[in-house]
Amino acid sequence: MTQNFRLENVGLINRNKKLSFKFNGKVYYGYEGDTLASALIANGVHLIGRSFKYHRPRGFFGAGVDEPYAIVQLFRNGETEPNIKATEQELFEGLEAKSVNCWPSVNFDIGAINNFLKIFLPAGFYYKTFMWPKSFWYRIYEPFIRKAAGLGVASIEHDKERYEHKYEYCDLLIVGSGPSGLASAYSAAKNGARVILAEDKSRFGGTLLTSDVNIGNEKGKEWADRIISELKEMPNVTVKNRSQVFGYYDHNMLVMSERISDHLPKTKKFHPKQRLWYMRAKEVLISSGSIERPLVFGNNDTPGVMLSSAAKEYLKVYGVLVGKKPLIFTNNDSGYETAIEFKKNGIDPIILDTRKNPQSEIIDEAKNLGINIKLSYVVIAAQGYKKVKSADIAKISDDKEQLGTIENIKCDCICVSGFWTPTIHLASQSGNKTKFSEDIDAFVPGKSKQNEKTLGAANGVYTLDETLKSSFETGYEISKQITKNDNKVSFPNVVEKKSAVHDKFWCVPLPKGKNYKRFLDFQNDVAVSDIEIALREGYRSIEHVKRYTTLGMATDQGKTSNLNGLQLVSKIENKVVPAVGHTTFRPPYTPVSIGAIVGREVGKHSKPTRKSPMHSWHEKHNAVFVDAGVWLRPRYYKRGDENLFEGSKREAKNVRTNVGVCDVTTLGKIDIKGPDAAELLNRVYTNAWLKLPIGKARYGVMLREDGIVMDDGTTTRISENHYHMTTTTAQAANVLSHLEYYLQLVWPNLNVNVVSTTEQWAGAAIAGPKSRDLLQKLFPKSDVSNEGLPFMGYIEGDLFGVKARIFRISFSGELAYEVNVESDNGNFMWEKIMEVGEEFKIQPYGTEALSTLRIEMGHVAGSELDGRTIPYDNSLEGLLSKKKDFIGKRSLSREAFTAEDRQKVVGVVPLDKKTSIPEGSHLVKDSNAPLPNPKLGYISASCWSVEYDNPFSLAILKDGKKMIGQKLFVMSPLKNKVIPVEIVSSHYVDPKGERVRS
């Protein structure tokens, strides 16, 4: 098989290593060093996919991260990965890829019918089209939209690859290995600084790889190769290719994704596929270069239309011609450089220059080579469907408003250059306030907020001599400040050709009678007409225009479209671009795989799964287990063919009528000892603790410093200076860390020790109206009467020869006790409870029944204490002391926390007393109100009340106290439910608490 578009003896690929690959089921070949894009172009493949909305044919537009639409589904080593840019994916033996967003094939796509319906699918059509009839949404509209959405297909298989995280520190982090990156890295490293140099591509050098400029006595590429070789030999330098720095965060922390094995057929054993680097740098130099800007004209999305710089890169780096009859459409001298490279390799290009009479050495060189140059000319429209076949061109007036006679010229590619846009993403993410440069018609970094500087083309500097000079100097000055060394390297002379001023023109007007689509965002099919519609419909903020039209919201995040979009809004609104502003640059700069973000945190953690001493008993009695943090707890005890609902309902009902026992070993337990133990409790809890009697327990709430509830639980005074604290299962470790932090760093003067005793004690909660009768038989020598062991009381007893702690505490709303014994005796305790309790019809109950009981009682738990609520929200304001200080007290006085209509925990009952209420559902006043329907609250927990035999829920409701008795609606879009409900007290069962005190 021949490659008709591959040049001999041109490029940087390894022609000694031929690689075979498949695209859309057909076998092709390329070479080591190719990307999938360059190999496909070499084989004459230009149609790679379909656009998102209109399913128009799509080819290649860029040559790297700037690529807006050449994305594929990749298959490697038996696994698949969606939305991979063909311009970034390096070729390897056996690579398989296929087109996305097309059916049944890329050549014949049924979805292309959308292109003929485009008059009905303008910007924002989805906000207007699917509004009526309302009943069609769930049955017709939503399924249709979901099926049409998306590009590639995510794998449903377990990812077998390995990913890693690494943490690194350096004096100087340099992003980009172009001229400015190499110069600053070399200068700083020679002066002793610890340097990390990160390059996104596989090859170092940036634009020097495609430039013929000399640096000193060396070609640009030769100079870059020598500098990189020297840097790699330096012990104070880390050089990374295939590494994208995608996020800049506070305190000079940057995150980088390193692609270690993506270019290999198979990841080496014990090697990661990708590695995420978290880097702290004293100084950061951003040398990320610029992205060439497109020119906007009719059908500018046709395969064969691409950036001029991309065409040059394919030619000089990969030895690939993007066409044999190229048309160069430019408003600056960069297009001439590409045309010259075509001419030197035997291809005759035609240049259309929007400028009237530009003068420069580069233009003179093009003229001397005999290149056909048409000044004051523009491309009206590309002609062709699956590939450019010709172009309609015309002369344009000096004011860029009037077009001359339209001509048609044959061509097989159109290489466009609308000047350059600095890559300012990282600078903006750092907090840098960007500014607009009238000289280059683009935004550049402003004043630094963190320790960062931007150099070279990323800062709007496009002369190599000035770039190298400032970069060498900056690297030296920064390293001198850090290392105190003074080893300054000299920088070489650069002789380069001067360029003419670019033309501030980027969008070709439509000829009369023509309605060509002129695209800005190529992946999402956002055209000039879409921006015009958005502005006509009243959207003025550029952020609103972005979201209404989806401009810049595709997988490329608008790298080639955003600035042209801003220019269009500026022109239509008659505002200067700075007044229009720009959208927010958010990380990541390029897509990052979920695997890399997760790293090694997959599957079960290395932490052992904890099991209570009674676990074997639970297993023997058909317990169905559930993960509760690091513990395995019985969810319910299955009888026969019972399901979860039936089993948990039976268990909860038995607690309400007889007696039940629950394994509560998993609750956090902390021993607090010392003369200042009470003082510690008094500071971390919101209520008073200094006068708690020995043998008494008290319920307490802990807050974070911001006033949000951290945890709740009971603490019992065992003796004079000894307290036993219990926490929720989920927060046990956090509470211990919380106490240790304050004792070590904030109150080191307190004489008190804390230690976790969770695993030292086995616990059983005995609850139900017959629980005292059972307890009396278990502890015949102890007084467990209401007088001998009152509510929130504590005694010690003898359980058939085993010492036990007995707490009268209830989480169920029933008369209840908790019995603790040493863990080694846990199973003995449990078996004795079951044996003695048989006459009282005892049944074990799991976490599901426990949840039902606590919801009926109105006791808040993790779903209410979710890190977003304060004591008032949970009806715990009575525990807030007005006399003493405690952690988080000041924060409770914040305006939002003292609002009169603050949210509150309430009860919710369906009016029909039958329909179960899904957790997470929203509460609204009017289910038929127009969207967005104001949300009044949400359902935090739901159960089937065994007391009243109907559904009951807890909710966090705005102004909940005043809403009791009112009728609202619960709406669950996920379950497609609208449920009329009544708001009631959260204390659904025994609101006066008579049972727990009986």
Residue ranges and their predicted role:
Residues 2-609, 760:
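Residues forming the flavin
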Residues 19-21, 72, 254, 625-626, ...:
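Short acidic-hydrophobic surface loop/beta-edge motif
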Residues 23, 74-76, 628, 705, ...:
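Structural motif
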Residues 198, 290, 539, 649-665, ...:
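Residues forming anionic-ligand binding surfaces in small-molecule and nucleic-acid pockets
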Residues 548, 564, 571-703, 708-710:
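Acidic, proline/glycine-enriched N-terminal capping motif
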Residues 615, 619-620, 633, 719-721, ...:
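Conserved, structured C-terminal
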Residues 38-48, 675-692, 773, 777-782:
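A short, contiguous, amphipathic alpha-helix enriched in charged residues
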Residues 690-721, 726-742:
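Well-ordered mid-protein domain cores that form the structural environment of catalytic cofactors
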